[in-house]
Amino acid sequence: MKSTLYLSLLTLPMIGFVQAQGQHHLIDELSSKQTALIQATVNSVIAIDENEFVFNNALQNEDWNDFFYRHAPHLLEFKAVILHWAGHASINPKLLLALMELQSSVLSEPSKSNIMLPFGTLSNKAGFAEQVQDLAITLNQRFYEYAQKVEGKVRSSPTNSATSSLISVLIKTQLKPYGSLNKLVGIYETLSNVPLLLSQNKTPAASLNPSNSFYMSFPWPSGYAWYSGGAHSNTGSGYPYSSLDFNNGSGGWGSNTPWVQAAHGGTVTRYSSCNIRVTHSSGYATQYYHMSNLQYRSGDVINSGAWLGRYANNKNQALCQGGQSSGPHVHFSLLNNGRFTSLHNWYISNYRIDVGNSNYDDNCRNFYFEKNGYKTCAWRALYK
């Protein structure tokens, strides 16, 4: 009886509370013909290494200034845009650059026109930043869309989510994209000196269970309560439900927003003035988006509870490289070696998370934080 009453109380509406949530990136659906063509194509090619597809932990240590000086000095002014969207979508920046070179030769033969449209006809957006955002988000969503479809199934071919994601992008402009995929592999390996293909003696990346050496705390001080909406994917649609939007209920744009703490210790990667990641020695990481006043730079090693910065109270700062947000909050995500990872059954400050059945599911029968037998629903006070 106690649990029934408790759930009833927790699902009562809150009066006067600002329910701030984040971005909803929607991409074009593939037609059935395109889907069939992708499947036929990926069955005939060697798989892309998924660890090279994502913004993996090794890449967090890259000297990106040096990389751009050596390979694309004329794109240095766009480095922040590339790293922001590569970091946000967790797509390897070198892969994005290789795809640009494949489509427009913007690295080897830069011009005013191909700098404006670096991905050419792969994107229907106009402008360098707009195309980078579009391709990074599309590659992200296609990658996890395919991962969801094959989860739990026996793989009968070497193909994987990375291969399917790239083919789904290339197929927009070509009937036989595997030729371009082979060219992309060559360009990438020239840029990075690392193989892009999954070798025959290397097993595909697999989803991992929660690590015993990794523990997360809520990103705010002990004794205080913040609020969360339903779990969702990093982009707000699709899969996996890796992200939560936290705020302390202080109000809308222009309000006095609080400082955000690191949920665990580790090494910092700062992608932009509003986007930062902390990578733990276990390989897991948490990412914090819509931030301001960031206190650390890439390479800094911090402890759990370190003050990362505030979540932004200014919409332009919260969306420092574009995107969407309904109000001030921190967009908090879990990753493992660059792959967004479902928060289902993970513990944070000793609360177990049930992610629900859909993006932003705030029905307490589905989404909740559970601690000591009690459930806290979406938009209810979460005490640390």
Tell where the protein language model's regions lie, with residue ranges:
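Bacterial N-terminal signal peptides
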Residues: L7-G16
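Non-catalytic cell-wall polysaccharide-engagement segments
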Residues: Q21-L37, L122-G229, N366-K384
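Short, functionally critical alpha-helical segments immediately adjacent to catalytic or ligand/cofactor-binding
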Residues: L83, G87-L107, L135
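Acidic, glycine-rich catalytic/binding loops that coordinate metals and/or anionic ligands
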Residues: F214-M216, G254, N303, S325-K384
